[in-house]
C-alpha cells in the first residue's frame, strides 16, 4: 500500500511538472507572437528612416547638387489579388543624372464596374539603394480611389542622392529598379461633419 501511495505521489508530481512546462511553453509562444506583431510597425519605421530593405526616402526639397554621372532607373508595377486594375508605368525606364530631379508617370485603370480603392507599397532594388532614392511627390503617399472604368495618371517626382557615389557597396550599380504593388483596401469612411455650436446671448 505504501509503495502504491508513493507511486501515486510521484505520478502527481510528474503531471504537475509537465503542466508547468506546457504552460511555460505556451506563454513563451504567445509572447513571441505579440512581439512579432509589435515589431512590424517598428520595422516599417526603421526601414523608412534608413532605407533598409529597399524602402525609399521621402523628402520635401530637391537636390542642390547634380553630377555628370548617370544612372538608369527602371519601373515595375504589380497589383495584388482582389484589385481589378490595369496598373503600369508610362515609361519602363529612364536614364538620369545623379541628383537631377525627374518626373515619371504611372497609369491605372479600374476594370471593375464598381468604385475600387487601392494603396501602393513600394521598394527599390538593390535594397541598399533605397537610402539614396528620394521621392518628392508620389501617388503612394495617399490612398487611391478609382471609379468604374476610370483612368488615372499617377506622377512620381524623384532624384537619386549624389551621396550614392560615395557608398563602396554601390560603386558598380548601374541600374535601380523602383517597384510598386497596389493592394485593395476597404472604402474610406466619411469624415463626420460636426457643426460647431455657437454660443447664444446670456449663455
UniProtKB/Swiss-Prot annotation:
TM region positions: 17-39
Main location, first listed in the record: membrane
Subcellular locations according to the entry: Cell inner membrane
The gene coding this protein: ctaG
Protein name (record): Cytochrome c oxidase assembly protein CtaG
Entry similarity comment: Belongs to the COX11/CtaG family.
UniProt topology in membrane: Single-pass type II membrane protein
Functional summary from the UniProt entry: Exerts its effect at some terminal stage of cytochrome c oxidase synthesis, probably by being involved in the insertion of the copper B into subunit I.
Keyword annotations of the record: Cell inner membrane, Cell membrane, Copper, Membrane, Signal-anchor, Transmembrane, Transmembrane helix
Topological domains, Cytoplasmic: 1-16
Stretches in topological domain Periplasmic: 40-203
NCBIfam families: PRK05089.1
One MF term in the entry's GO annotations: copper ion binding
UniProt cross-references to SUPFAM superfamilies, sorted A to Z: Ctag/Cox11
GO biological process: respiratory chain complex IV assembly
Gene3D superfamilies according to UniProt: Ctag/Cox11
InterPro entries tied to this protein: CtaG/Cox11_dom_sf, Cyt_c_oxidase_assmbl_CtaG
Amino acid at each position: 500500500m505504501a509503495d502504491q501511495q508513493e507511486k501515486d505521489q510521484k505520478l502527481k508530481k510528474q503531471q504537475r511538472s509537465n503542466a508547468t512546462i506546457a504552460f511555460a511553453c505556451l506563454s513563451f509562444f504567445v509572447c513571441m507572437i505579440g512581439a512579432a506583431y509589435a515589431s512590424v510597425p517598428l520595422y516599417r519605421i526603421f526601414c523608412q528612416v534608413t532605407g533598409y530593405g529597399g524602402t525609399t526616402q521621402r523628402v520635401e526639397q530637391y537636390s542642390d547638387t547634380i553630377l555628370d554621372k548617370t544612372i538608369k532607373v527602371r519601373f515595375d508595377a504589380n497589383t495584388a489579388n482582389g484589385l481589378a486594375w490595369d496598373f503600369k508605368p508610362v515609361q519602363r525606364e529612364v536614364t538620369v543624372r545623379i541628383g537631377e530631379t525627374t518626373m515619371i508617370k504611372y497609369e491605372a485603370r479600374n476594370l471593375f464596374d464598381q468604385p475600387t480603392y487601392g494603396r501602393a507599397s513600394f521598394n527599390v532594388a538593390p535594397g541598399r539603394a533605397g537610402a539614396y532614392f528620394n521621392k518628392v511627390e508620389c501617388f503612394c503617399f495617399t490612398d487611391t480611389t478609382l471609379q468604374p472604368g476610370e483612368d488615372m495618371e499617377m506622377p512620381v517626382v524623384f532624384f537619386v542622392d549624389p551621396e550614392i557615389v560615395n557608398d563602396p557597396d554601390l560603386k558598380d550599380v548601374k541600374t535601380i529598379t523602383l517597384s510598386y504593388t497596389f493592394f485593395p483596401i476597404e472604402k474610406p469612411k466619411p469624415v463626420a461633419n460636426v457643426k460647431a455650436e455657437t454660443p447664444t446671448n446670456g449663455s
